[in-house]
Amino acid sequence: MSKRDFYEILGVSKTADNKEIKRAYRKLAMKYHPDRNSEDPDAEEKFKEASMAYEVLSSEEKRSAYDRMGHAAFENGMGGGGFGGGGGGNFQDIFGDIFGNFGDIFGQSRGGGGGRSRRGSDLRYVIELTLEEAVRGCKKEISFTAPAPCDTCDGKGAKNASDIVTCQTCHGQGQVRMQQGFFAVQQACPHCGGTGKQIKNPCSDCHGNGVKDKSRTLEVSIPAGVDDGDRVRLAGEGEAGGAGVQNGDLYVEVRVKQHNVFTRQGADLYMDVPVSITDAALGKEVEIPTLDGKVKIKVAEGTQSGKLLRVRGRGVTPVRTTMKGDLICRVVIETPVNLTREQKDLLRQFQDTLDGDSKHQQSPHKKSFFKKIGDLFD
C-alpha cells in the first residue's frame, strides 16, 4: 500500500517555509486530536499521520532526506536518523511548542474522568477606566465566568480519594509511544490525559474533570499611572487546572476612555486652550483645568495660534516610575463670529491702521509668507 505524500497530508507546497508547515500542522492537530474526537474512529489515525508529516518536514535534515528519497529515506534506519528508538524528534516537544499552555483544549481524558496534564489556561478580562481612574489608581470589582475547582469533590474529580488509581495504559508515566510501521511518536496518554492517573468512580457533578464553570467576582487594585493597553496580572486567578494541576493567571487589560479635555501621550497630558484674538494680541493670564485642580498660565502678548505652553509637573506619573510628566497647552486663537455692524466697522478701522512697514512688523507670519512667495519668483 503506497504511503501518502507528507506535503499532501499537511496541505502545503514543497516550497513551504517552517511557519507555513507549523501553521498547517496546528490546524490539523486541533481538528483531529483524539481527545476532541472520541466519536470519530478515524481521527486518531489522521492525527498520527499529520504528526509524522510534521516531524519530518519541520526538521531541515529529515526534510532534505525526504525530498531526495521520499519515504524510503526512513526505511531500515536509512538517512535522517529514522523514527525508531531515540533517533526521531520528540513529539511531546513539538506538541508543546505549538499549543503551549492551552491545556483546556486537549486536557480531558476519553477514559471517563482523567484530569489535565497542563496548568489551567490564562484568562483575559478587559476593563474600562476613565483617565482620572487610570492616572490616580483605583479599585474595581469585576465579574466573570470561568472554570473553578468543583465544590463536590474539592477539585479531585473523584468521589473518594481511593477512586484515583494509576493508569494501566501508561503505568503512571503519562506518556505513550505510538508505533505505525517505521514511525514512532511519543504523546500524552489518551486514556489519562497525560496525568498518569485514572478515576474509577468519577464525581457526578464535574464528571471527573475536577472543575466546573462558576461565576466569580473579584476586586482588582489598579495601580496609579496605568495606560491604555497595560495589563494587571492576578496570579492563580485564571482557569482552574483541576486535580493536582496549577491554576492559570488572570490578566486584566486596561482600556482608557477618551477624555473630553485631555489627551495622554506617555507621561504628558495635552489640551487645547481657546484664547480670544484680543487676549492673544494684548496678552493675558488664563485659568485652565488640570487633573489636580485649576492653575493659571500666562499667554504672552502677540501669542500665535498653535503655540505650545508647558505647565511642568501637571502630567502623569507612569507605573513603575517616579518622574511626573507635564501638561502641554496648545493655544487655539478663536476668530469672532456673528459680528455686529459696529464691530465690523471697528475692525476695518483697525485694519487701516496696519499699513506700511509697521503692518509687516505687526504680522510676522504674514511677512514671512509673502517673502517666501517672493523668493519663488526671484
UniProtKB/Swiss-Prot annotation:
Q: How is the cofactor bound?
A: Binds 2 Zn(2+) ions per monomer.
Q: Where are the zinc fingers (CR-type)?
A: 137-215
Which gene codes for it? dnaJ
**A biological process from GO:** protein refolding
For activity, the cofactor(s) needed are: Zn(2+)
Q: Which Pfam families match?
A: DnaJ, DnaJ_C, DnaJ_CXXCXGXG
Tell me the domain of life.
Answer: Bacteria
**Would the keyword Nucleotidyltransferase be found if you checked this record's keyword annotation?**
no
Q: Which CDD domains match?
A: DnaJ (cd06257), DnaJ_C (cd10747), DnaJ_zf (cd10719)
Q: What is known of its domains?
A: The J domain is necessary and sufficient to stimulate DnaK ATPase activity. Zinc center 1 plays an important role in the autonomous, DnaK-independent chaperone activity of DnaJ. Zinc center 2 is essential for interaction with DnaK and for DnaJ activity.
Gene Ontology MF term list: ATP binding; heat shock protein binding; unfolded protein binding; zinc ion binding
Task: Identify the GO cellular component terms for this protein.
Answer: cytoplasm
The main location class comes to cytoplasm
The answer to whether keyword Ribosomal protein applies is no
Report what the protein is called: Chaperone protein DnaJ
What is annotated about its quaternary structure and interactions? Homodimer.
- Residue sites binding Zn(2+) 1 per the record: 150, 153, 203, 206
